[in-house]
Amino acid sequence: MQFDYIIIGAGSAGNVLATRLTEDPNTTVLLLEAGGPDYRFDFRTQMPAALAFPLQGKRYNWAYETEPEPFMNNRRMECGRGKGLGGSSLINGMCYIRGNALDLDNWAQEPGLENWSYLDCLPYYRKAETRDVGENDYHGGDGPVSVTTSKPGVNPLFEAMIEAGVQAGYPRTDDLNGYQQEGFGPMDRTVTPHGRRASTARGYLDQAKSRPNLTIRTHAMTDHIIFDGKRAVGVEWLEGDSTIPTRATANKEVLLCAGAIASPQILQRSGVGSAELLAEFDIPLVHDLPGVGENLQDHLEMYLQYECKEPVSLYPALQWWNQPKIGAEWLFGGTGVGASNHFEAGGFIRSREEFAWPNIQYHFLPVAINYNGSNAVKEHGFQCHVGSMRSPSRGHVRIKSRDPHQHPAILFNYMSHEQDWQEFRDAIRITREIMHQPALDQYRGREISPGVECQTDEQLDEFVRNHAETAFHPCGTCKMGYDEMAVVDGEGRVHGLEGLRVVDASIMPQIITGNLNATTIMIGEKMADMIRGKDALPRSTAGYYVANGRPVRAKK
């Protein structure tokens, strides 16, 4: 089998590339996905409110676990990643958050990455998006990904939480992806107008999968990339339960889009990575690239949970006897409780003046429950997810075996810097202050978690050690740049090799301020033009907010 391009991984970036590259009818593409199809009849991945379900099994989730995390009481922590067409966009929380403009401007300060500035990237965010209220300087009106805005009157807790943030002295913003990210406001979601999850399988592949020049193989577990000298010339994979490898050749390029955990694994198995690590497993060295699998970053978050004194939370939706009605409303009308992910309000703040742009993110949820659906509080409640955004802690992903089915060693080194502890202490104390504003007086009952007895630095630190969880935002393991630990250049081409690019969240040099999915899709769109040799879209001229030393919050 021969193709122009072979794409490994049908996730948030891979599906963008598959769709854009096959717009040219003369270009042939093979898209390999280790998981299965995105079954449209499966409410677990299609109903926004069911977002906890795909994380519970292994049909749609790789369900990786970390090594014991040394600064988290040696907990082995969850590291869920999407499996199936759509990748992590098939199982994520559907928050459409792009990050802060200064994240990208910060990338662009690296020599060779100048064209990754916010204004260079904004046209690609717009190209990918159809926002339900129409386009403007910041948002697209005819892209493949449906974005739904929060509508007034959904739940009084959303507005009360935003108002509480404002009463605490923080800014209000109408659009967390618009002129000003900093502040509290409604949150956009990747949900279709019919109340379905807008994964990249739905948005992109639906328009491309019938093209004769696109071949999609599911249940295709990539074993390794085939090289001829320093040139990538094909891919070998295992189909289904078969132990006999299948191979295909790429006339132009192999495009690795397997995500921040799997992309470095595949490179390492293929002979690209730290020579020392590869020697351990007798893998013939193709190219010594010490940065492969290093620079691993993530967002850590914790929940502050409160009783709700009024019966306005989503608690009744957790009762089995209410679920048939909710399911029917969603199935037949695309409306009701099932049609939202219920992360409809949030915010970004600076916890201290020394941060030039926000370093803390909030998601509000009108029910008290763990992200994966466990430990639901048996009463009306609400919670606030809070976490730091640009931790200095760095980890790694390293293979433990040549067997593609064997999970790698994943270590994030969460909370390994004093800055991490300071940010979380600040975040908990600021959150309590926000929660005690007048806007929440009629709703706020007792603090369920961490609980009012948890006050000193030592008590807060111990709570974080035992209860902070991943926000499922791993990135950075094949970072873009030109220093000795960089893996790819500014166009995603792997240093020292030919015919091989990495296009996914692993190339982010530094994690962004917010959820990763929207930016991963943008990276796919921008790289698709680079791969095709097309001129970049014209730079945006939109304005954007920079704090420039303004106070963190207004004096009361």
UniProtKB/Swiss-Prot annotation:
GO terms for cellular component: membrane. Pfam families: GMC_oxred_C, GMC_oxred_N. InterPro entries: BetA, FAD/NAD-bd_sf, GMC_OxRdtase, GMC_OxRdtase_N, GMC_OxRtase_C. Keywords: FAD, Flavoprotein, NAD, Oxidoreductase. It catalyses: choline + A = betaine aldehyde + AH2; betaine aldehyde + NAD(+) + H2O = glycine betaine + NADH + 2 H(+). Its EC number is 1.1.99.1, 1.2.1.8. The active site is at residue 473. The keyword Phosphoprotein does not apply. Its cofactor is FAD. Pathway: Amine and polyamine biosynthesis; betaine biosynthesis via choline pathway; betaine aldehyde from choline (cytochrome c reductase route): step 1/1. It is an enzyme of class 1 (oxidoreductase). It comes from the Bacteria. Involved in the biosynthesis of the osmoprotectant glycine betaine. Catalyzes the oxidation of choline to betaine aldehyde and betaine aldehyde to glycine betaine at the same rate. This is Oxygen-dependent choline dehydrogenase. It comes from Escherichia coli O17:K52:H18 (strain UMN026 / ExPEC).
